[in-house]
Amino acid sequence: KIKSMSLKELYSSSPLGMVSSVLYGTIQSALFTLLAVYAAAMNFSIFDISLVTFMLGISGAISQYPVGYISDKFDRRKVIIYSTFGAAIFAFFAIFSGGTMYLPEGLGSSKFWFYFFLVAFSMCSLPMFSLILAHTNDFITRDKFVAAGAGLQFAFGLGAISGPFLCSLFMDLVGNNGFFVFLIIFHCLIGVFAVYRMKIRPSEENPDSQFVAVPTTITPVGMELNPTTEPIEEPEKIK
């Protein structure tokens, strides 16, 4: 039987899951809405902008599986920490290869290194919500997986509301590269909070929990793709 779970109970079960969902919602909404704006401001051609968005999505999708395999073998919080700080590092390098600060010998002018760092950033960042969901499931029973997933996606949606606005403020204050500065700061916030949670709470092994790649939508529909959750019983129709 599927049990309900309040947001307060969800936060008590996994503070990292709730806080990270809000922060990551902010990150991903800004990433997918303003990446094309950033590329256009950096004088990328229409083809380059299309290629950038394609490479972002496909590399993030491919990385779901190796990241998920690793997270099932080690403490998921460590994987979250390495992923967030890794994404921050690659975002930092992307600043210096985006078109205004070319690398030596003109390598940056071909934008090869920008694509390279963007793909590396995507492979670290885009599996994050699935990691957060799997980490949260480590601390709850199987009959609450659906409710927890819905709660995390609600928290993700709250963050997604403010992401584009906050990122645009960074771009106004810092310039075009404020886009990546924003991503660096918010990824580091998740990583720092994960380090803090590791120090005050030991890891737990839950045999019912495993990494499942799910879409980072703001509705609970994605949870239906999770094979570890049991189907929700539909109410009987009144004749």
Task: Please provide the spans of the model-predicted regions.
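Helix-to-loop junctions at the C-terminal end of transmembrane segments
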Residues: 63-75, 171-172
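Intrinsic disorder in cytosolic terminal tails and internal cytosolic loops
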Residues: 197-239
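C-terminal ends and interior cores of transmembrane alpha-helices
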Residues: 86-106
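Structural signature of the two symmetry-related core transmembrane helices
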Residues: 78-93, 184
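Helix-loop boundary and gating motifs at the non-cytosolic
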Residues: 17, 28-42, 48-49
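Loop-to-transmembrane helix entry/capping segments in MFS-fold secondary transporters
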Residues: 46, 140-152
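A membrane-interface helix-boundary motif in multi-pass transporters
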Residues: 169-187
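Intracellular juxtamembrane helix-capping segments at the cytosolic ends
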Residues: 126-140
